[in-house]
């Protein structure tokens, strides 16, 4: 009986460890590892993310099993276990930002660049004969070497349907020193004729590509971006 109890506890701790890891992401892709395993379901008018539900259920029942054996005060009821499960997932995602930066610090090329997605956003203001790209890209060089590169921003789907251009290549060349955090402010105009008089995007979901003569690194957009891309 004790062997079964020990196995149950060990399995519960292993599940918690796996969820902790899978709630993270690589920064290059904003989707968590859990979301990449349990991919969102795309409907005509939206997306259903069920990976979060699976994560909560796994953490909840792991906590329940631990409480059944250990009688832990803070997880002895349905509500307390649910609250702890949600906090556990939030803390896992938060801690992942630090582990990702540590991992990137071992690179000596563009893979050492970390993007602060919460501080990065881009506007596309499209008039009949002109497209203005402006916004802020917040990055950190996690390595001990200087990194130099240019940036491409993937064209928003509705704009791409009219100009047939995959990326806007920004003219500014970026140089970022070791361990430096930089906010890059963008404001560039491109001459294009649009079928529609006005299109406006103000989002932080876009895909960005950092590139130089040696290599490139892609920071993928959110699932919402690719959902919209599939509509056009």
Positions of PLM-derived features:
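Low-complexity, acidic Ser/Thr/Pro/Gly-rich terminal tails and inter-domain linkers that flank the onset
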Residues: 95-129, 158-160
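Intrinsically disordered, low-complexity Pro/Gly/Ser/Thr-rich segments with frequent PxxP/GP/PP motifs
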Residues: 165-195
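Short, solvent-exposed loop/turn segments enriched in Ser/Thr/Gly
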Residues: 129-136
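Internal/C-terminal transmembrane anchor helices
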Residues: 72-101
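Membrane-embedded alpha-helical segments of integral membrane proteins
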Residues: 14-66
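Membrane-interface helix-boundary motifs at transmembrane edges
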Residues: 1-5, 66-79
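Terminal connector regions
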Residues: 190-232
């Amino acid at each position: 009986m004790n062997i079964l109890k020990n196995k149950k506890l060990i399995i519960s701790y292993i599940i918690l460890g796996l969820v902790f890891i899978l709630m993270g992401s690589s920064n290059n892709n904003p989707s968590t590892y859990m979301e990449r395993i349990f991919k969102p379901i795309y409907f005509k008018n939206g997306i259903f993310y069920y990976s979060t539900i699976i994560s909560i259920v796994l953490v909840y029942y792991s906590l329940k099993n631990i409480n059944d054996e250990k009688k832990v005060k803070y997880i002895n009821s349905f509500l307390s276990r649910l609250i702890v499960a949600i906090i556990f997932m939030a803390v896992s995602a938060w801690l992942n930002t630090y582990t990702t930066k540590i991992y990137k610090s071992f690179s000596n090329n563009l893979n050492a660049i970390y993007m602060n997605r919460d501080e990065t956003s881009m506007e596309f203001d499209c008039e009949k004969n002109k497209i203005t790209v402006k916004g802020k890209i917040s990055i950190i060089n996690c390595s001990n070497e200087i990194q130099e590169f240019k940036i491409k921003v993937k064209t928003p789907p509705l704009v791409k349907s009219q100009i047939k251009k995959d990326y806007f290549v920004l003219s500014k060349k970026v140089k970022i020193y070791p361990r430096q955090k930089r906010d890059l402010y963008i404001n560039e105009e491109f001459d294009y004729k649009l079928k529609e008089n006005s299109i406006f995007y103000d989002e932080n979901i876009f895909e960005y590509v950092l590139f130089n003569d040696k290599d490139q690194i892609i920071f993928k957009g959110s699932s919402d971006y690719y959902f919209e891309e599939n509509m056009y």
